[in-house]
């Protein structure tokens, strides 16, 4: 069920056409800055992959991908849910070296998404990945990369604030770091999402680390597929969004599994049979490079920097008609 709402008294500060112009400004500026910060080359990306390749992202393990057959092929294909695993293979196939990386515009359909102000069945993000060395496979590398991405976010906010005087600046000078276990210890009686809002409200911007494995409570902070992020070396970039008074995730990222952590996480998740899929088998056999990577929401970023109340104001998607009508009655058009 859609749980979208409008904050009391909210009125868009840009009309639809002005918003379209502003969206391009946000995307163009951030994309250029990110490529410089992380030494990334833009590449073309697939919209769908073979169902039997093991390349699609299984997300939390319960979301159903959109699948269909192709007349001249002997296997079904799936719309990607992210490019997390495809990018790792592409780095090898395209001849990238340690310290070099790629990024792509990723469009996905997540049919089982619970829609609200931040979540849509259509996902658009910059998916990036770069090769690292065995010596770089540590938390210091992770934090250094988070700070580089955060610099791009702050540069973008400064640029948009100069273009539109109503934007102002929300982001603090530095991003903070905390693990999911530290967060659970601080707020044991709150849900994971409530904990995120509390720490985001306190810090302004925070990287919440180590997502996917079980905490001391016996429950994970959030779900993560077992075959791309190393759950001990990943996290989310979360900022505080005053307009909605909530934690606002802009990016999910991490150092990717090696053979050891992949085997361990498949076992913990109870799906060791996935080790027989082509991508996972190549990884276990040492045929893929060590990498780190992530996704950065394009519409999420535009919504945040243009101070919009709903992602449908910056993204053309499908919403329940009652939501569309209710928003239109208050002067807000969902694309």
Residue positions per predicted region:
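Generic recognition of stable, solvent-exposed alpha-helical segments in well-folded globular domains
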Residues: 21-25, 29, 137-144, 148, ...
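A glycine-rich phosphate-binding loop feature that marks nucleotide/adenosyl-phosphate handling sites
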Residues: 47-51, 165-171, 320-324
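A translation/RNA-centric and nucleic-acid-associated enzymatic feature enriched
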Residues: 109, 180-335
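A general structural signal for short secondary-structure junctions and capping/turn motifs
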Residues: 68-70, 92-98, 118-120, 168, ...
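A generic secondary-structure signal for well-formed alpha-helical elements
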Residues: 34-41, 149-160, 309
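Class II aminoacyl-tRNA synthetase-like tRNA-binding/catalytic domains
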Residues: 2-119, 127-131
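Extended, charged alpha-beta segments that form solvent-exposed binding/catalytic grooves
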Residues: 104-194
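Short connector loops at helix/strand junctions that flank enzyme active sites
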Residues: 74, 100, 123, 203, ...
């Amino acid at each position: 069920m859609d749980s979208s709402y409008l904050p009391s008294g909210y009125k868009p500060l840009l009309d639809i056409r002005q918003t379209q112009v502003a969206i391009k400004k946000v995307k163009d500026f951030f994309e250029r800055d990110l490529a410089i910060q992380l030494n990334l080359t833009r590449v073309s990306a697939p919209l769908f992959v073979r169902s039997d390749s093991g390349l699609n992202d299984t997300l939390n393990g319960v979301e159903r991908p959109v699948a269909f057959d192709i007349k001249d092929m002997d296997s079904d294909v799936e719309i990607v849910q992210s490019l997390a695993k495809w990018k790792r293979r592409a780095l090898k196939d395209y001849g990238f070296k340690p310290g070099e990386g790629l990024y792509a515009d990723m469009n996905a359909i997540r049919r089982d998404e619970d829609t609200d102000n931040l979540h849509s069945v259509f996902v658009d993000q910059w998916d990036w990945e770069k090769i690292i060395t065995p010596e770089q496979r540590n938390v210091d590398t992770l934090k250094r990369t988070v700070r580089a991405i955060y610099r791009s976010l702050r540069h973008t906010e400064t640029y948009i604030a100069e273009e539109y005087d109503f934007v102002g600046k929300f982001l603090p000078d530095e991003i903070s770091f905390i693990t999911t276990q530290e967060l659970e210890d601080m707020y044991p009686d709150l849900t994971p999402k409530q904990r995120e809002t509390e720490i985001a409200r306190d810090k302004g911007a925070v990287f919440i680390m180590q997502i996917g494995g079980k905490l001391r409570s016996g429950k994970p902070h959030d779900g993560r597929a077992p075959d791309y992020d190393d759950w001990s070396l990943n996290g989310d970039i979360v900022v505080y969004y005053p307009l909605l008074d909530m934690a606002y995730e802009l990016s999910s990222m991490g150092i990717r599994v090696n053979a050891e952590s992949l085997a361990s996480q498949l076992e913990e998740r109870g799906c060791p049979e996935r080790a027989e899929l082509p991508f996972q088998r190549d990884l276990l056999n040492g045929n893929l490079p060590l990498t780190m990577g992530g996704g950065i929401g394009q519409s999420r970023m535009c919504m945040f920097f243009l101070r919009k109340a709903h992602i449908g104001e910056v993204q053309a998607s499908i919403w329940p008609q009652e939501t569309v009508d209710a928003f239109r009655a208050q002067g807000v058009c969902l694309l």
